[in-house]
Regions:
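Extreme N-terminal starter segment of soluble prokaryotic enzymes
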Residues: 1-4
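Active-site nucleotide/adenylate-binding loops and adjacent lid/helix of ATP-dependent enzymes
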Residues: 83-170
Length: 170
């Protein structure tokens, strides 16, 4: 058995490499971002890739590669059932509703008009969250309709920066 490991210093791959070395497990270091990644994996039985939720590049690509490889029969970590809802509050909401888990009342909007209408009728304060973001990142306490309307317009127009340095210090 030979495991491919996406080598990313300072991530879980450091521990995976050390483990393989200590246990005599054969592995190969790969770069999942290379166009030749599929070819690079032909002599491997599995792929391990810990991608970071704050990397827009990884978020756009990792799930597609891992799912494609899994569909071809390759063992991957994380697998589709582990990763599809990772750092995805919308996916998590629907999953929790589908299994009947207790859930804080949650509203998701796909149109600005519907969101602004809801904001005009709801009570405050409300917690606004973007789809992604760990910890308190992309979370705002909204105290009134005016503040809500401003955030809704921003969300449906130019959007929010992927990384908010001051917000990450909260």
């Amino acid at each position: 058995m030979k495991i491919a490991i996406h080598n990313s210093r300072g991530s879980f791959s450091d521990r995976w490499i050390a483990y393989c070395d200590s246990k005599g497990v054969e592995y190969k270091l790969v770069d999942c971002y290379k166009d030749s990644i599929i070819q690079d994996l032909t002599d491997c039985d599995g792929l391990m890739w810990h991608f970071h939720q704050n990397s827009p590049r990884a978020i756009l690509f990792a799930k597609q590669l891992l799912f494609s490889l899994e569909q071809s029969g390759m063992k991957v970590f994380p697998d589709f059932n582990t990763v599809w809802h990772f750092d995805d509050k919308v996916g998590q909401k629907y999953l929790l509703e589908a299994i009947g888990a207790p859930l804080v009342p949650t509203w998701i909007f796909y149109s600005k008009k519907e969101a602004i209408s809801w904001a005009g009728e709801t009570s405050y304060p409300k917690v606004f969250k973007l789809r992604g973001g760990a910890g308190s990142q992309n979370v705002r306490l909204v105290k009134n309709y005016s503040q809500a309307r401003r955030l809704i317009r921003k969300a449906f127009n130019r959007g929010f920066a992927a990384y908010d340095p001051p917000g990450s210090l909260k």
